[in-house]
């Protein structure tokens, strides 16, 4: 959908909602409206139930604590107010004529009211846990009155979350598993469904995410802070409003609102963060070449300001830095988890595996997070509200991964057991591999929402955009992304193997039998190095509008209809640079002995300090990726660069995709048996349009042609080539984003949710729905 059509749909939808809401007929009976709040905290309560006793007139408060009861009989009526965790309250109201009566209500947990003006008496409690207790009450109350299977939790429910990482919060919710990257929970899986099929929104608007591959649908939460949110909604059974791509559910993150509080509230904290393995004052080595601080400060704050009854705003933010160091041992067991080949790696039974590879790896990184958010709410009238929200977040890591690997490669039958492995003479290898990157992610998201909650018509319309950018930088930051130093032609043996690692590792020269020190960098030859800068962008545009109205057809019935347009644009570029080290003599080697000048000692990382005694492994002398790049820049003749491979990498990893999903839905809510049985059902229709570009490999572009455009043939009857060298051929035949893919399809998604109140504290639920798992964008932009 082009921008004009997109804007037209948004404007027409917004106008339709405004006119529908403005066309309400005057109420013919009395009404009672007001707000319900927690007397202790001043927080307005969402989904508090307000009932006119003895009638079927009932209303639930919205996110601002507001309620409105219509068609209230005249005379003296009693309002019954209920909210989980609070003392139920009954309030008498005298209703006269067809006027609207304002009545605000305050509830308190365990408190007793004698009259409306009496001071609230609070029970004894631990002050530090009050926010968590309020959060638990919110979660239970939301689930109690939800029409579908949903888990709504307050951002305060689990207390302080380290560095504001929302993944640390979400992993505690039932049915949700966080996918970890680099030791951080970053992506959401629900009920076993991969993260690429779990829609994530903020306030109902799609959240942009430039995930690592650049072509996936999974949403990374790096730049989202729990400190900027009011609550989290995990939906396990979709309704017609839910996107059709919710295979097992979706997650909506709700920003703070000024109208959630009756009075201004400021919360803030300042702290120092450190890992127990890295409590060191002053600068010490790691993760890169320059020493860094391992104990870092952080802060976070939130300020909610309801200025008056019509306007309010919120401001929140935070920043944190953590140093993380993680050692890891990796064992490769042949016959149990790794395959044998019957020759160099003899076959064995699962009860008698043998160790063929052992790796010592240490990861270290510095992770910086920062976030800022603000919202502004303005009431256009008694029933209409305009809300603006802006979210901004950054995530920056400087990480390194260093590995020492022992490889047997060949073993004879009878020379292994679960306790030892005797490697074949000269067949083994040890190597040092380093990888590191400088990653910077940024996300910003402005949104605007109009809400109307009138006595007859209720409507909502929204417009928002979310932008995310992710960059991996290495060469321009003064380092190679990867290096490899090798020592081949050695004999590797393992002895005294236990569950963690081999207690004794022996490495000897395959020819002389002399011991080789695998922890000394001078035992290795520098082999290869590479750089992989990557830049990916993702934009998500969202526009929606819906209206609903209540009917009484012998039973309570609500109909809701809406439109929804969501656009996604993903743009990814990557270039993989790979060089081979030859040295001054122009000859590559993997053994730094004799006449070889390829010794890795010339790029020894003297500044990096690995803690001694890491699982009993001696201190290792590592390669410096920074020094290797310095050597490459000062002595380029020592290296070879494959220009053809570099060019092909640039083109093959240049991809862009655009997707527009246009939706309409119709939802009906019906209640029976004195509102004990609730049915929610309907259908959603989604039209998907995709336009993608990727690499095009066209061999005919290298054919000579005559003036008429015909291919020129040689004496052998075959086309005559324009270029014969690999790079020349690649530049002619491999075209940047030359492949074009377009796809469109329409899908219907019916659904129904049923709930039955067996008892006041027991609800039975069932749901049936359909959904679709859209493929990775590489399916369209992968090229041909």
PLM regions and their residue ranges:
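Periplasmic N-terminal accessory/gating domains of Gram-negative outer-membrane beta-barrel systems
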Residues: 87, 97, 102-110, 114-198, ...
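Outer-membrane beta-barrel proteins
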Residues: 159, 222, 238-241, 275-298, ...
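Surface-exposed extracellular loop regions of Gram-negative outer-membrane beta-barrel proteins
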Residues: 206, 569-571, 651-655, 720, ...
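Outer-membrane beta-barrel translocator/receptor signature
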Residues: 213-218, 227-234, 241-253, 258-342, ...
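Transmembrane beta-strands of outer-membrane beta-barrel pores
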Residues: 255, 272-276, 319-323, 392-396, ...
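Transmembrane beta-barrel wall of Gram-negative outer-membrane proteins
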Residues: 290-410, 431, 438-455, 750-753
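Flexible glycine-rich, low-complexity coil/linker segments exposed to the extracellular/periplasmic environment
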Residues: 344-354, 417-428, 488-528, 584-652, ...
């Amino acid at each position: 959908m082009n921008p004009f059509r997109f804007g037209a749909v948004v404007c027409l939808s917004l106008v339709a909602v405004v006119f529908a809401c403005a066309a309400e007929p005057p109420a013919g009976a009395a009404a009672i409206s007001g707000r319900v709040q927690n007397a202790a905290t001043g927080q307005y309560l969402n989904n508090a139930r307000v009932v006119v006793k003895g009638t079927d007139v009932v209303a639930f408060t919205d996110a601002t604590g507001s309620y409105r009861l219509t068609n209230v009989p005249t005379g003296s009526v009693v309002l019954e107010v209920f909210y989980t965790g609070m003392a139920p309250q009954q309030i008498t109201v005298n209703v006269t004529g067809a006027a609207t009566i304002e009545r605000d209500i305050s509830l308190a947990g365990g408190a007793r009211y004698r009259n409306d003006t009496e001071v609230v008496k609070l029970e004894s409690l631990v002050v530090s846990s009050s926010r968590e207790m309020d959060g638990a009450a919110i979660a239970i109350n939301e689930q109690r009155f939800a029409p579908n299977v949903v888990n709504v939790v307050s951002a305060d429910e689990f207390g302080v979350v380290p560095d504001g990482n929302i993944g640390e919060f979400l992993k505690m919710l039932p049915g949700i598993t966080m996918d970890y990257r680099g030791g951080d929970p970053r992506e959401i899986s629900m009920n076993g469904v991969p993260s690429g099929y779990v829609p994530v929104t903020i306030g109902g608007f799609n959240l942009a995410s430039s995930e690592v591959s650049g072509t996936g649908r999974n949403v990374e939460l790096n730049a989202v802070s729990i400190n900027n949110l009011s609550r989290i909604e995990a939906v396990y059974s979709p309704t017609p409003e839910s996107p059709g791509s919710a295979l097992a559910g979706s997650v909506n993150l709700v920003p703070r609102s000024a109208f959630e509080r009756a009075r201004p509230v400021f919360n803030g904290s300042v702290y120092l963060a450190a890992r127990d393995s890295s409590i060191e004052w002053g600068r010490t080595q790691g993760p890169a070449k320059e020493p860094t601080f391992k104990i870092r400060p952080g802060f976070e704050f939130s300020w909610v300001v309801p200025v008056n009854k019509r306007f309010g705003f919120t401001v929140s933010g935070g920043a944190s830095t953590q140093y993380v160091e993680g050692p890891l041992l990796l064992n490769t067991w042949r016959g149990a988890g790794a395959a044998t080949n019957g020759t160099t790696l003899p076959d064995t039974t699962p009860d008698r595996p043998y160790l063929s590879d052992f790796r010592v790896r240490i990861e270290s990184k510095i992770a910086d997070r920062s976030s800022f958010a603000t919202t502004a709410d303005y009431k256009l009238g008694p029933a209409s509200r305009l809300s603006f929200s802006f979210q901004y977040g950054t995530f920056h890591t400087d990480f390194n991964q260093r590995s020492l690997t022992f490889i047997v490669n060949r073993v004879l039958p009878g020379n292994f057991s679960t306790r030892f492995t005797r490697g074949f003479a000269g067949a083994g290898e040890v190597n040092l591999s380093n990888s590191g990157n400088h990653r910077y992610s940024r996300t910003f998201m402005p949104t605007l929402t109009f809400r109307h909650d009138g006595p007859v018509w209720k409507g909502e319309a929204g417009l928002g955009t979310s932008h995310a950018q992710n960059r991996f930088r290495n060469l321009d930051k003064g380092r190679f992304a990867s290096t490899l130093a090798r020592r081949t032609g050695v004999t590797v043996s393992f002895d005294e193997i236990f569950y963690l690692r081999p207690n004794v590792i022996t490495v000897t020269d395959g020819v002389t039998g002399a011991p080789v020190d695998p922890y000394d960098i001078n035992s290795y030859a520098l082999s290869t190095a590479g750089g992989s800068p990557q830049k990916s962008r993702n934009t998500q545009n969202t526009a929606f509008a819906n209206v609903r109205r209540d009917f009484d057809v012998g039973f309570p019935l609500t109909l809701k209809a809406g439109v929804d347009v969501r656009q996604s644009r993903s743009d990814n570029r990557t270039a993989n640079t790979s060089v081979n080290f030859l040295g001054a003599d122009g000859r590559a080697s993997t053994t730094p002995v004799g006449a070889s000048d390829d010794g890795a000692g010339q790029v020894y990382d003297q500044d990096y300090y690995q803690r001694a005694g890491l699982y009993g492994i001696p201190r290792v002398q590592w390669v410096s990726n920074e020094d290797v790049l310095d050597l490459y820049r000062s002595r380029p003749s020592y290296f070879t660069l494959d220009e053809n491979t570099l060019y092909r990498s640039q083109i093959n990893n240049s991809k862009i995709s655009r997707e527009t999903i246009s939706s309409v839905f119709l939802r009906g809510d019906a209640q029976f048996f004195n509102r004990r049985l609730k049915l929610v059902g309907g259908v959603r229709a989604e039209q998907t349009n995709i336009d993608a570009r990727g690499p095009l490999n066209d061999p005919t572009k290298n054919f000579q042609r005559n003036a008429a455009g015909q291919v020129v043939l040689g004496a052998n009857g075959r086309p005559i080539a324009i270029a014969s060298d690999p790079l020349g051929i690649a530049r002619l035949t491999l075209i940047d984003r030359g492949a074009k893919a377009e796809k469109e399809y329409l899908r219907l998604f019916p659904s129904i949710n049923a709930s039955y109140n067996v008892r006041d504290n027991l609800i039975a639920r069932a749901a049936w729905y359909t959904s679709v798992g859209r493929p990775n964008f590489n399916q369209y932009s992968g090229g041909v």
